[in-house]
């Protein structure tokens, strides 16, 4: 992408952009919530649509001159409904957090009881964390994973639902490496008369092409981000049945947002168009193959993986078993060009600023073209560094091996 105007007008900002571009090219990106969008998506997001205010919805705007952005928003809505087989879609949420907020705003009153997954067990801030609006406004009761299997205990979810009678049950996670059984959650919700919402932000790209059970047939509401495994711009969306259209639309605008970001919605439309292409199914399948290949090597190297493996795009490593903290492990890997994030693990005794684990995912490296053999090499590098975080010879060798992989799979070549 050329930056002729920026090079003349604002070299300081351009330097930051180019430095980040260089970092993305030189590093192996394993943050599970990140991905690399196509250049077409970036072009749409950097278009003249950034100039247009468009409060309201297609055909019902509060501003004139919206006839063209109406077309773009309709394309985005139609495509995402086709992808997931949904009756209704709202593509205006600026983020997944705001998509969740809009659903809560639609069906809950402050103080209502909600059942959500514990953040340290793999949930999300917006699923009831006490430092988040969700935990402040609503009475969240937490469920989690068992100590022995480290997977969701559906009977425990059921017992908590029977005891607390929540108005809403939330499923979905930000650091859970196993497939979630949405049909079981639906049964529990029906048993206690609760609404059921799924936040599929992390797995949406897998769901889109049948690589994970779809929540759409089971949930009253489905929310997602549009980046991560969907490989679109940063943003959010909501899916539901047609009956909720008016209430959900009002909750998004004017309920929690003003004007939509039309340039981002255009980028969402482009990304959704890419998801509808046959190549995307191959991509999603490769994400899982890469995650499994990475897990196999790490397990063979003696690195403990939460739940013993993965069914999706991410792995959660318990680095405490190697005598490290997540903070130390993240820094050690970053030094050799592998980007991860420290992450709490179930029943963690460390603070969220230190943690006992790191989270790694394969969406971004898969977008670069990494295959199973590449991931085996990545796994070997990770294991070597985590076992010898202070060994300069090991780190020098790791840097060379990382460079060989990033040179083999250039970004935006």
Curated annotation (Swiss-Prot):
CDD domains: SHMT. InterPro entries: PyrdxlP-dep_Trfase, PyrdxlP-dep_Trfase_major, PyrdxlP-dep_Trfase_small, Ser_HO-MeTrfase, Ser_HO-MeTrfase-like, Ser_HO-MeTrfase_PLP_BS, SHMT-like_dom. It catalyses: (6R)-5,10-methylene-5,6,7,8-tetrahydrofolate + glycine + H2O = (6S)-5,6,7,8-tetrahydrofolate + L-serine. Keywords: Amino-acid biosynthesis, Cytoplasm, One-carbon metabolism, Pyridoxal phosphate, Transferase. Homodimer. The lineage of its organism: Bacteria, Bacillati, Bacillota, Bacilli, Bacillales. (6S)-5,6,7,8-tetrahydrofolate binds at residues 119, 123-125, 351-353. Its cofactor is pyridoxal 5'-phosphate. Its EC number is 2.1.2.1. It is an enzyme of class 2 (transferase). Pfam families: SHMT (PF00464). GO terms for biological process: glycine biosynthetic process from serine; tetrahydrofolate interconversion. Its main location: cytoplasm. PROSITE patterns: SHMT (PS00096). The modification N6-(pyridoxal phosphate)lysine is found at residue 228. The record marks 227 as: Plays an important role in substrate specificity. NCBIfam families: PRK00011.1 (NF000586). Belongs to the SHMT family. It is found in: Cytoplasm. One of its GO terms (cellular component) is cytosol. SUPFAM superfamilies: PLP-dependent transferases (SSF53383). One of its GO terms (molecular function) is glycine hydroxymethyltransferase activity. Catalyzes the reversible interconversion of serine and glycine with tetrahydrofolate (THF) serving as the one-carbon carrier. This reaction serves as the major source of one-carbon groups required for the biosynthesis of purines, thymidylate, methionine, and other important biomolecules. Also exhibits THF-independent aldolase activity toward beta-hydroxyamino acids, producing glycine and aldehydes, via a retro-aldol mechanism. Pathway: One-carbon metabolism; tetrahydrofolate interconversion; Amino-acid biosynthesis; glycine biosynthesis; glycine from L-serine: step 1/1. This is Serine hydroxymethyltransferase.
